[in-house]
Amino acid sequence: MKIIIHYALILFFTFVNSAFSESKYHHMPHGKFRNPEGSPVRDPNFKWSYKTFNEEKKKIKISIPTDHVVPKNQVLENINKLKNEDYILWIGHATFLIKLGDNMIITDPVFEKNMGPLIFGPKRYVDPAIDLKNLPKINYFLQTHNHYDHLSTRTIKNFPFKNTEVLMPLRLSKHFEKNNYKKIIELDWYDQKKYTDITFTFLPSIHWSKRSLWDTNKSLWGSFLIEYKDKKILFLCDTGYGKIYKELGKKYGPIDITFINIGAYNFFPMAPKKDSSIYHTNPEEALQIGRDLNSKKLVGMHWGTVVLSLEPIMEPAQRFKKNASKFGYNENDATLFKIGEAKKISELIK
């Protein structure tokens, strides 16, 4: 594990490298990474086309239900009301606040209107639930991978808490170093970082990395297992479905709450069939991962914010709820948030 630490308080923490196996299958020659052994591979008949994608994207109706978003002033009021509670708040897409005791965690923060380089890339149809300047003090910044809808250099530059602990996959530190972050920690799969009352373990996911024409899979991707007191929370985004999750379930389950992507799965007609993305689970695959992990609760994310694929914008949530019972979950176990909504963890885990 490569650790870049620019501060002197290291004695307060312990660092543990807990390898899941002796092999490093995901480390490839020439400095690239790959998915866990036995993961699905892209259908050779998948033919990406910006022209086709943009033509099909224009057919998607952006109709936002009135109850999909909590007003910003109410979001701030709720944060203040819950200051003595543990809670989860959805800012949008893959960005959440997770409060556990005195620990405030933010995941994959992106606060810009468009999720791409400069002024390019897909544009949000729902703004972030809170402005960057109004964030509560953040103790831990979790970065899962480098795609533009998860890693924003503008958010990193303007983030108000440069002294926060930033945990990320291998080879992502440059984005933070040049913006003068003080506590930067790169993790390989199965590496663990322990603090006084909270532990983070970086685990595999089935995905990829890319920000330019020249850096495909040159940085790692993954998920974060958060352990606090007797709770286990897994932030799993982005991922496709694969056998690795049964293995992780045996090793780390049961999980109390798993955050998982339920949108961005349909690329037909470029893909030979619908719902066939190997890098983003459809709602049913997300529910199956929950079963494989022995996760008590699921939180659906990566939907309802920006158009990244070709399914109707509310379809992921509808299918997630509709099919939950087929995988042994009731509607309360397969949880969805409004953008800006905060829920007490004590009410999620009963």
Q: Can you name each region flagged by the protein language model?
A:
Residues 111-128, 208-216, 266-280:
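Acidic/histidine-rich helix-loop elements
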Residues 2-10:
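Sec-dependent signal peptide recognition
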Residues 22-28, 33-36, 140, 165-167, ...:
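Cap/insert and terminal regions of metallo-dependent hydrolase folds
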Residues 98, 108, 145, 152, ...:
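Divalent metal-coordination and catalytic microenvironments
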Residues 109-111, 146, 205-206, 237-239, ...:
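Active-site metal-binding loops of divalent metal-dependent hydrolases
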Residues 120-168, 253-259:
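Active-site metal-binding motif and surrounding structural segment of the metallo-beta-lactamase
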Residues 18-134, 168-237, 256-262, 321-341, 345-349:
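Metallo-beta-lactamase
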